[in-house]
Amino acid sequence: MAVPKKRTSMSKKRIRKNLWKKKTYFSIVQSYSLAKSRSFSRGNEHPKPKGFSGQQANK
């Protein structure tokens, strides 16, 4: 069974962790911008949820 010879240093761990965080951050930003562009491509600046008529119900 393969076993690592030495312990990974804290600096290497930190570098690898930061790379992982950076990749996830950019993928989140990209997906958010894509979703934003798709919602605005319909022509509505503020799309309304389904079933919203804009009128208040009478009490």
UniProtKB/Swiss-Prot annotation:
It is found in: Plastid, Chloroplast. Residues 37-59 are annotated as: Disordered. GO terms for molecular function: structural constituent of ribosome. Keywords: Chloroplast, Plastid, Ribonucleoprotein, Ribosomal protein. InterPro entries: Ribosomal_bL32 (IPR002677), Ribosomal_bL32_plant/cyanobact (IPR044958), Ribosomal_zn-bd (IPR011332). GO terms for biological process: translation. It comes from the Eukaryota. The keyword Ribosomal protein applies. GO terms for cellular component: chloroplast; large ribosomal subunit. Belongs to the bacterial ribosomal protein bL32 family. This is Large ribosomal subunit protein bL32c. It comes from Zea mays. The gene is rpl32.
